[in-house]
Amino acid sequence: MRNSIALLGLALLAAACIRDPLFPGTPRYSHEPGGRRTDSTTTDAPLAGEHIYLTAVRFPDGYAWDLDTCAVDGEVWIDLYRDSEKVRSIPAGASVHPDMHRYLGGHLYTDWSTDTETVVSREGAELFRFEGREAIRGFLVREDGVHTLGQDRDGNGFTYRIDGRILYRSETGAVLGGPDTPGAAGGAFSEYGEDVFYVCCLPSERGKEYHVMRNAERHQSFPISDGTRAVLVAGGKVSRVRSKPRSLVLEVDGKETRLALGGGESCLWSQLTAWEEDVLALVCAQGSGGKRFFLQTAGGKTFSPMPGETVSEVLSDGQRMGWTVTDGRGDLLRVRWSDGGVTEGTGGFLVSGRCALLRNGHLFLALTGRAGAPNRFQEDGVHTDFPFNGYFTSVTVE
């Protein structure tokens, strides 16, 4: 599966304690238990030699974590499940936010900030710390060490580091993208060969500009004034959605495809995803009749969600492509597939985009219950209840 960077605008920084609403941004809540699978398009490709890993934050029984994650009396844990069996638990400390812990390469990594420093740990043991309070937007484990891309919590600027050592530092600007993207193990980072890519927004004499960075150098730049709406780096190629005077285009390595905006419609937001050897744009358009969603590839394929449905995430793995459908509060209702199939939800919400994964044609959803409803792991429409007081934060297949 390709890692990618999708530009949707600035991600809100994670806080050590989270009060109502539970997490920054729109919660992805759901309510209807007992959903069932209604399509027959699941691939039979086995996950040979691979295991399913879930991360979750667990609070003491009876504690109302959905109202306040700070005023807890008792231990809070980050749990790791392998194939539905709990295999590891570490104290959560200040890392309860889903952006502040991740499972990668057989290890559970956490980060948190003191009043002056940022600390990165593995299995609860400190790996390194560095001066400055940073929200980690990109995280990779490579042969040369742990790569982090941190947004300054106390102001503008960001830093690219390896094991805490600075490779690139900007005193202004912001990282775009982050750990909430489905299937993007590196968060705001994207790998291609020996290179690491990421996208940032920096001020310039021409106003703000989007920069595609390759390692510690600027690789490509787009001024905001030219209408750039979204940027993707995948497979070493740079793609973007761009507004022009009378059209909206998807540009891949300089080649433009006109996107299917209707007469009188404008683009509210857009998102880019790599799919097979193509690039897919999800567009939310606004017209006189209200909002409309559509998906279109650079190769010209177009997919139209059902009228009135809200699309929140795009899932792809090179074999299949689908999109999550949510209601007005962000409740997960179903996943629709590009071939016309449907997988119904079984109740629960996605705390993070990393709670949804498409791998080898199989759909995995780590769904957190609301108002006492059970937490559920759903694989290809079949769910398993997990009776703990807390929330899922990711699903990974390795």
Report the location of each language-model feature.
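Structural motif
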Residues: 61-79, 115-120, 154-161, 204-212, ...
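Sec-dependent bacterial lipoprotein signal peptides
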Residues: 1-16
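Bacterial Sec-dependent N-terminal signal peptides
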Residues: 16-49
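Short beta-strand elements that form the blades of beta-propeller/WD-repeat-like
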Residues: 48-68, 102-113, 145-152, 194-203, ...
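A short beta-strand motif characteristic of beta-propeller blades
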Residues: 86-91, 125-130, 166-179, 217-222, ...
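Acidic, serine/threonine- and glycine-rich low-complexity intrinsically disordered segments
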Residues: 182-187, 192-296, 310-321, 325-328, ...
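Blade-level signature of beta-propeller repeat domains, shared across WD40, Kelch, NHL, RCC1
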Residues: 357-359, 365-398
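Repeated scaffold domains used in trafficking and secretory/extracellular systems
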Residues: 94-105, 133-143, 174-193, 225-235, ...
